[in-house]
């Protein structure tokens, strides 16, 4: 019985994390789908200073910064990167599961273009 409880607990956690990956579903306050077709999905992303997202996943994506800002990203393996962007800056992100946090002093507003193919 002692072995069953941890296995059940881990199984439940895995199911929660697996379902909690789509940013538009787990964090609609920060992610809004503004376009979706079989090739791409475009997310409107907004984070005020100090705001943090829950754990979520993206496929490969292009990020277009509408405003500048400083964002910290912590991946599922615990790696942390901090990036400062300028308005109009474009960047590539490999598919990943992560948490994002606005560690700057201004609201971050960006478009995330997720590639489906």
State where each predicted segment sits.
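Positively charged n-region of N-terminal signal peptides that target proteins for export
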Residues: 1-4
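Bacterial N-terminal signal peptides
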Residues: 6-15
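Sec/Tat signal peptide C-region and signal peptidase I cleavage site
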Residues: 16-20
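A short glycine-rich, His/Asp/Glu-containing loop-to-beta-strand
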Residues: 27-52, 63, 113
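Short acidic-glycine-tyrosine-enriched beta hairpin
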Residues: 36, 77-95
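Histidine-centered metal-chelating micro-motifs
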Residues: 50-53, 89-101
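Glycine- and acidic-residue-biased ligand/ion/polar-headgroup-sensing regions
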Residues: 58-77
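Ligand-binding loop in jelly-roll beta-barrel domains
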Residues: 68, 95-116
């Amino acid at each position: 019985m002692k072995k069953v409880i941890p296995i059940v607990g881990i199984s439940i956690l895995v199911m929660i994390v697996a379902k909690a990956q789509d940013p538009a579903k787990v964090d609609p306050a920060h992610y809004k789908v503004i376009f979706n077709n079989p090739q791409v999905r475009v997310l409107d992303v907004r984070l005020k200073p100090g705001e943090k997202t829950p754990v979520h996943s993206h496929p490969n994506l292009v990020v277009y910064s509408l405003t500048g800002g400083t964002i910290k990203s912590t991946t599922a393996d615990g790696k942390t990167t901090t990036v400062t962007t300028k308005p109009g800056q474009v960047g590539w992100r490999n598919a990943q599961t992560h948490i994002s946090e606005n560690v700057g002093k201004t609201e971050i507003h960006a478009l995330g273009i997720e590639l489906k193919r």
